[in-house]
């Protein structure tokens, strides 16, 4: 008689995976989590101290960066990417991350691989000061090839209604501060995989795949600290669509545009290499973060102090542009 295992789904391996995963998830739990993993749903109590609490949610994945991870069997950092992509998005509205859930899909489940993926998720949650309260691992033979994995996540944060960052006070003359990225982050990998045919080729003394699997930077701690001290008017997470798509998302008014000085900071070597190999500059700014992973909009008289504060926290940051009256979109010059 045909069994589920013979159909390609190994329930015992699933149980073993859950056992390994639980140990990582436990390390992320805050006092606000009301139950552990294994229930039908995760429950989180809202923290005290919020007058009009608003929940802010975001979901994302890692895209085809996972193809490189699968080919090189290096899975312990892409979970960090997954968390970063979600929490950096909700951070743009001033939200402090509360909890996170993940979704892993594969063709054939290997408990050690799913454990490595969740290890990264847990690391990202700890860095983001949020709890991993649940998730789903789906073994789907026929939908995915053996050895292929995918991961996505869902983050929820909290902010007081009167402290939501929505760009409503941004005006002409305000300045833009860019916080450095850790590398390519998690966007543009379909293009990258076309450019770098040989993932083992040398890049500054290491294989290019190692550089490409550098995890996405999480900006939660430095940005939440800034929000307590400065009037941050708008924020943007530079993800898919690069500068051209993401920076205008911080604006809520028509009649304003963004000017970026591309010479205001040193573009990292990985992006220079992509241009050397044939990717045009405009395409680069329309696809990648170009070394700037997160952008803040502040009053001109706060620029120096914000840069000092970021430096104290170990962040590389630069004044990269300004808000302009008239026009639309982004001008890079």
From Swiss-Prot:
Swiss-Prot/TrEMBL GO biological process terms: 'de novo' IMP biosynthetic process; adenine biosynthetic process
Subcellular location, principal: cytoplasm
InterPro entries the UniProt entry points to: PurM-like_C_dom, PurM-like_C_sf, PurM-like_N, PurM-like_N_sf, PurM_cligase
Family, per entry: Belongs to the AIR synthase family.
Catalytic activity from the UniProt record: 2-formamido-N(1)-(5-O-phospho-beta-D-ribosyl)acetamidine + ATP = 5-amino-1-(5-phospho-beta-D-ribosyl)imidazole + ADP + phosphate + H(+)
Molecular function GO labels: ATP binding; phosphoribosylamine-glycine ligase activity; phosphoribosylformylglycinamidine cyclo-ligase activity
Keyword ATP-binding: yes
Protein name: Phosphoribosylformylglycinamidine cyclo-ligase
Compartment(s) where it occurs, according to its Swiss-Prot or TrEMBL record: Cytoplasm
Keyword terms: ATP-binding, Cytoplasm, Ligase, Nucleotide-binding, Purine biosynthesis
Organism: Clostridium perfringens (strain ATCC 13124 / DSM 756 / JCM 1290 / NCIMB 6125 / NCTC 8237 / Type A)
Catalytic EC class: ligase
An annotated GO cellular component: cytosol
Pathway in which the depicted protein is active: Purine metabolism; IMP biosynthesis via de novo pathway; 5-amino-1-(5-phospho-D-ribosyl)imidazole from N(2)-formyl-N(1)-(5-phospho-D-ribosyl)glycinamide: step 2/2
HAMAP family: AIRS
Domain of life, per lineage: Bacteria
Species lineage: Bacteria, Bacillati, Bacillota, Clostridia, Eubacteriales
Annotated EC: 6.3.3.1
